[in-house]
Amino acid sequence: MEFISHFLRATSRRTAALGPILQRNRSEIIQKQSLTNRQAFRRYRSSCSTMDTTVHSAGIDETHLVPMSVIQRPIPSVLDEQKVQSLMETIKNETSEDEVPPIDLLWISGSEGGDYYFSFGGCHRFEAYKRLQRPTIKAKLVKSTLGDLYHYMGSSAPKYLA
């Protein structure tokens, strides 16, 4: 308790000179701050392209065409049929295919040099490409580790990859 009170006293001495500023209506200050934060977030969000919408791949610009056959999807998808059909129509049309964002793939290099690709999101896009029998799908590769994979799969994650 002595340790904490030391810092509280030091803080209170520093802020004593700010008397008139601290007497302002706190809710007014909080409202201004949150409004400013919301405006900044909206500006940031509108400046981002639609392709950079995921947490994992927001900083990755490079898109690859990855063979569907090498992608592992360990968690079964729960799909909205209308969404899959809509995506299929968009993908079929060559001019609008670019509107479909790439999926994120966790890319894990095996201990003996093999590459493994795991997909946990993009279920509807993956299913649309699969039903259209496309050999490849647009993807952003997120370099990952077995530890990252463990976060998704828990104890079902493989202990090692060759």
UniProtKB/Swiss-Prot annotation:
SMART domains with a match to the protein in the record: ParB
User: Mind giving the lineage of the organism this protein is from?
Assistant: Eukaryota, Metazoa, Ecdysozoa, Arthropoda, Hexapoda
* InterPro entries membership: ParB/Sulfiredoxin_dom (IPR003115), ParB/Sulfiredoxin_sf (IPR036086), Sulfiredoxin (IPR016692)
Role, per record: Contributes to oxidative stress resistance by reducing cysteine-sulfinic acid formed under exposure to oxidants in a peroxiredoxin. May catalyze the reduction in a multi-step process by acting both as a specific phosphotransferase and a thioltransferase.
The UniProt entry, under Gene3D superfamilies, shows: Conserved hypothetical protein from pyrococcus furiosus pfu- 392566-001, ParB domain
Organism listed in the record = Drosophila melanogaster (Fruit fly)
EC number, as in UniProt: 1.8.98.2
Omega-N-methylarginine modifications at: 24, 38
Explain the consequences of disrupting this gene: Five day old adults display increased levels of hyperoxidized forms of peroxiredoxins, and both males and females show increased locomotor activity. No effect on lifespan under normal or oxidative stress conditions.
GO molecular function per UniProt: ATP binding; sulfiredoxin activity
Which GO BP terms, alphabetically? Answer: cellular oxidant detoxification; cellular response to oxidative stress
- In Swiss-Prot or TrEMBL terms, this protein is called Sulfiredoxin
**What domain of life does the native source organism fall in?**
Eukaryota
Q: Which family does it belong to?
A: Belongs to the sulfiredoxin family.
> For this protein, what reaction is catalysed?
S-hydroxy-S-oxy-L-cysteinyl-[peroxiredoxin] + [protein]-dithiol + ATP = S-hydroxy-L-cysteinyl-[peroxiredoxin] + [protein]-disulfide + ADP + phosphate
